[in-house]
Amino acid sequence: KGNMTLAEFEEQQQLLAYFKLAEIEPSKQAGGGSAANTMFTFASLGGKPFYACRVGDDAQGEFYLKDLHTTGVATSKKSVHTGSVTGSCVVAVTEDGERTMQTYLGTSSDITAENVDFDALTQADWLYLEGYLAMTESIQPAMIKLRQQAGIHNAKIAVSFADPAVVKFAKDGLLNMLGNKVAVIFCNSEEAKLFTDKKQIKAAARALLEHCQTAVVTDGANGAIIAHKSDDHSEL
């Protein structure tokens, strides 16, 4: 309860079948995901985001892309992979407000450079990368090319660590994503401490400035700490 569990396609179908037997029908279907939610919020604030992803040529994939387009998030035809199954997440919410999730990644776990429209970056001011991609080996060549293209077109890079598990199990992938340095890092206090090996949030935020110009570290009910480096000094 309260956690997210990864599942295979058959396990996802078994769970849905169980809910059906228990006469529990899905109350809502909606697009989601770490980076997709960020793009949705950005579009809601008046931005014009482009989102690179990978879905199947099935009903769920069609719904997902339509949901993004309706909210003002642009995508590419390269996002659709023929003959594959779109990932999904079953979210059960109990009366106490706890969310328990089972996620089937589907074809999204096989995203490669073929699913990325690099031309979209030529008109972008920012390139936003989510930390979960650090755990996907097939996307690493595209990550390198995206960083190179961002440099060519003077686009700033922002990276979200996404989850403590990413820092624990894919730190090398995160370091590859960060390269020499990025403009902004977004993470929570646990992720910041894990990444920097610091015990205090302020020390962790300052240590992150070795990899970025600005670090935004959220801390639950305590709000957030923003560390910024300019010239030869840093400030919180």
Predicted regions and their residues:
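Glycine-rich phosphate/adenosyl-contacting loop at the front of the ribokinase-like
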Residues: 1-50, 62
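Alpha-helical transmembrane segments within multi-pass membrane transporters and channels
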Residues: 54-56
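Phosphate-handling active-site elements
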Residues: 46-52, 232-236
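Ribokinase/PfkB-type carbohydrate-kinase core domain
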Residues: 1-8, 26-30, 62-87, 91-236
